[in-house]
Amino acid sequence: MRVRKRKLPKKFWAFKSKNLILTFGKSLILPVVVFVIFSLNGNALALSKDGKIRTVVIDAGHGGKDPGAMGKTIAEKRITLAVALKVGEYITKNHPDTKVIYTRNDDHFVELYRRADIANKNKADLFISIHCNASKSRIHYGAETFVMGLHRSQANLEVAKLENAAVLYEDNYQSQYDGFDPNAPEAEILFSMYQNLYRRQSLLLASNIQNQLNAVASRFDRGVKEAGFLVLYRTTMPSVLVELGFISNENEENFLKSKAGQEKLALAIAN
């Protein structure tokens, strides 16, 4: 990210002075747990009746005043929007009975928590958040798909930090996300429920997307991973965050911004 005029408080960034931290405070964990139990049980029952996917929410990362990661010639927000809209078009064409909802369908800013709210209020069966990766090293390449979980590696943490930095554009981010720490002991309660209710479906969705990105879009497969993404932790359905490729890599940037590349990426996700 090239924008950072405001800095997050230390509790938002530092765990032993290095890791991104948004703490699951004791005051928050119980209401969140209760909310998730009731919300997820309802959604799980709906999915178990016939297994049909009736509503999919497609989330184009960043937007408006938040450009996302910057390539040499294009901002992440433009790529994610183009691909997200194409994903929706493919789903509508091939699965006319499935309703597609976008968290944004033009270049405007949407807070991370509102993206999850859109999915929850519409009782979505799937939530797919679309992003582009970036690295200080321009040699990194490939696609990877994340599910909500613990920061099991420094690399996963860095990706989460990159995407979570979108909160810097939100006026009330300190109060809105106070209490979020995927690595806090209290979080095990939430992740335990997550695993029992829809983590398995999220992993299955992520695995399918990765396979298709490799087969259809010829993307190097960086695998299915988990990390603490703010945009995922409030969703009450199977949800994934897709990193299409590295916008910091010139070759991948050229593919990501090309019409042909976007068509292939969208088709892979929609499959």
Regions found by a protein language model. Name each.
Residues 44-180, 195-207, 211, 263, ...:
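Catalytic-core regions of hydrolytic enzymes
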